[in-house]
């Protein structure tokens, strides 16, 4: 997205231009703490808003069903080569439109309807696509679930092994949407081998940390790895499938196209290539390390202020606040922090007595605001702001002061200062 493109948009469709302007301002004025969100670079947005959006390209590089794909092939092959280098994969498919699409392509390859899959309970930090009854994964397959220990709130690998021995799943899924500790992929491999299961890692949340060595890499231990390309990887919204097994990789390719998708979104694939190129640079490794340092600073300060952190801390980019410690629900906290321009999301905590629509938790993450340049000092201040508002929900004067502190942080670390959207006045 460039100023030129925005100028054209403001002239041809001022209504949409106006909406974009409002959203840009919202992003600039808020502390974005949703763990699954990030701010892409201007280069990623430029690729995604490019002429590649005009081209159909069913198939793979050098194996297309349409003519005129020679430059599309170059862009997609560059994305493939870069991501294989980034993660150490032997095979990669960069075409899935989303992480959910990537997961379903894997299921289509490895499973038949009625087969048993084993993933983490959604309420413990799993994901909808890992067997939730409201998702196709929970409708087409027999699902068994594992969770965390009631005492430590961490993965209990002995219990996971016991469940696997009893249920004999065909596929075991590890990788989560709300788990703040490192995953031992080697232990999962041993469990899968004992029961004869495939092992899949969904690293959508931690991909950027894996790419830079700040989290163990699942590829040496898993049959297949899926991920989104946004979140900690800081690319466009999309999905990705990787494996060390090239023959299995060819089967995944067929499950993406023609199995679950038609034409790929090659403008998004090009944006993925840009993001993978950025992630290969030394600066991105520094960024990933700062993401973790900032998350730990935030969790530490909230804990110091008396707010319970699930698992008592974090090893990655996110944390879960158990708000029973302050007599509040996740829904209430979500609404409360939004009044001071902090964006977060309510989330279940392990063994949560509340419904998923209310919850006892609030999920926070550091990737987006780390991208804006905030460091540990600023995240400690964010921790104090959040603690102040959660511990004093009825103090209007304090709420006003907290909103001003948020505004000061946002002004000190501007977002996309080069972007300007001028919207003509409507008659």
Curated annotation (Swiss-Prot):
Enzyme kind, highest EC tier: transferase
EC number(s) on file: 2.1.2.1
GO molecular function, one term: glycine hydroxymethyltransferase activity
GO biological process annotation, one example: glycine biosynthetic process from serine
Residues of the site described as Plays an important role in substrate specificity: 230
Binding site for (6S)-5,6,7,8-tetrahydrofolate: 122, 126-128, 247, 355-357
Subcellular location: Cytoplasm
CDD domains the record matches: SHMT
Assembly description: Homodimer.
Family affiliation: Belongs to the SHMT family.
Function text: Catalyzes the reversible interconversion of serine and glycine with tetrahydrofolate (THF) serving as the one-carbon carrier. This reaction serves as the major source of one-carbon groups required for the biosynthesis of purines, thymidylate, methionine, and other important biomolecules. Also exhibits THF-independent aldolase activity toward beta-hydroxyamino acids, producing glycine and aldehydes, via a retro-aldol mechanism.
UniProt name for this protein: Serine hydroxymethyltransferase
Organism: Microcystis aeruginosa (strain NIES-843 / IAM M-2473)
Gene name as annotated: glyA
């Amino acid at each position: 997205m460039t100023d030129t493109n925005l100028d054209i948009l403001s002239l041809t469709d001022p209504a949409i231009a106006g909406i974009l302007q409002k959203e840009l301002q919202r992003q600039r004025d808020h502390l974005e703490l949703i763990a699954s969100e990030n701010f892409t670079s201007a280069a990623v947005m430029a690729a995604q808003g490019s002429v590649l959006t005009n081209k159909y390209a069913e198939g793979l590089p050098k194996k297309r069903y349409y003519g005129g794909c020679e430059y599309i092939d170059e862009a997609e092959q560059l994305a493939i080569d870069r991501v294989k280098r980034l993660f150490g994969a032997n095979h990669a498919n960069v075409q899935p439109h989303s992480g959910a699409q990537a997961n379903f392509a894997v299921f289509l390859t490895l499973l038949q309807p009625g087969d048993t899959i084993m993933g983490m309970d959604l309420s413990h930090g799993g994901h909808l696509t890992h067997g939730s009854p409201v998702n196709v994964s929970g409708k087409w397959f027999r699902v068994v679930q594992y969770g965390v220990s009631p005492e430590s709130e961490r993965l209990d690998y002995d219990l996971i092994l016991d469940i696997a021995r009893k249920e004999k799943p065909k596929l075991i899924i590890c990788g989560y949407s709300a788990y703040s500790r490192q995953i031992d992929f080697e232990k999962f491999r041993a469990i899968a081998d004992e029961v004869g299961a495939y092992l899949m890692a969904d690293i959508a949340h931690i991909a950027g940390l894996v790419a830079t060595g700040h989290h163990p890499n699942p590829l040496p231990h898993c049959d297949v790895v899926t991920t989104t390309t946004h979140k900690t990887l800081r690319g466009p919204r999309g999905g990705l499938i990787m494996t060390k097994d090239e023959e299995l990789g060819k089967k995944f390719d067929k499950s993406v196209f023609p199995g679950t998708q038609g034409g790929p979104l090659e403008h998004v694939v090009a944006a993925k290539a840009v993001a993978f190129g950025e992630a290969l640079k030394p600066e991105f490794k520094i960024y990933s390390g700062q993401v973790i340092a900032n998350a730990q600073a935030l969790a530490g300060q909230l804990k110091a202020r008396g707010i319970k952190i699930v698992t008592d801390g974090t090893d990655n980019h996110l944390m879960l606040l158990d708000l029973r410690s302050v007599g509040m629900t996740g829904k209430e906290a979500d609404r409360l922090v939004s009044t001071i321009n902090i964006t977060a999301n309510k989330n279940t905590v392990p063994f949560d007595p509340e419904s998923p629509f209310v919850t006892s938790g609030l999920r926070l993450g550091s990737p987006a605001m780390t991208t804006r340049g905030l460091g540990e000092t600023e995240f400690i201040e964010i921790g104090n702001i959040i603690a102040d508002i959660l511990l004093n929900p009825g103090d209007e004067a304090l709420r006003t002061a907290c909103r001003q502190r948020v505004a000061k942080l946002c002004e000190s670390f501007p977002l996309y200062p080069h972007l300007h959207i001028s919207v003509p006045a409507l008659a």
